[in-house]
């Protein structure tokens, strides 16, 4: 499910639950990394993370907040319900409102995002880099600390006033 679909799901669930004012921030990421030692795979890791922080304002304009990693329809409804329950305990001395900048576009330098190459390709590239480094000078006997990783992430903010902001990036890191 992409961030627009999640926003639609939250909006529909909020309407169903009769919640008029809400917002959410989300972070989604996929990370892959490899390490080698003398050409042998030492560590291979892949992870996928998704987290939503949802705020709900009750009819007294008190705010409740909850966090979930369940982005299914039932998970989103449950999170909205929990945030609504939490709003009963909101601070009466503080009134939180949407930022007037929430609908402003995010100015991001456009950079080509890459698709994941995957663990096998990362492992092959790192093995080749280790061999080249070992062969580059006779005094280099081993490369005990090395790694190659790639990360892909998206950050999202949306609210019941129609704001939707999103930022995504991919990056790779090599250390030898």
Regions found by a protein language model. Give the residues of each.
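Active-site bordering "gate/hinge" segments
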Residues: 1-176
């Amino acid at each position: 499910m992409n961030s627009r679909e999640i926003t639609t799901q939250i909006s529909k669930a909020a309407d169903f639950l009769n919640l008029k004012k809400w917002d959410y921030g989300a972070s989604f990421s996929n990370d892959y990394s490899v390490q080698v030692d003398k050409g042998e795979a030492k560590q291979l890791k892949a992870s996928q993370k998704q987290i939503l922080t949802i705020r709900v304002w009750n009819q007294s304009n008190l705010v409740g907040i909850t966090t979930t990693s369940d982005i299914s329809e039932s998970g989103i409804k449950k999170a909205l319900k929990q945030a609504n329950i939490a709003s009963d305990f909101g601070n009466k001395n503080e009134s939180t409102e949407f930022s007037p900048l929430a609908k402003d576009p995010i100015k991001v330098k456009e950079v080509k995002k890459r698709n994941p190459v995957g663990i096998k390709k990362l492992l092959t590239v790192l093995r080749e880099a280790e061999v080249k480094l070992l062969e580059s000078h006779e005094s280099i006997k081993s490369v005990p600390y090395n790694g190659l990783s790639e990360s892909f992430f998206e950050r999202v903010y949306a609210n019941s006033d129609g704001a939707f902001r999103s930022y995504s990036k991919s990056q790779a890191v090599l250390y030898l």
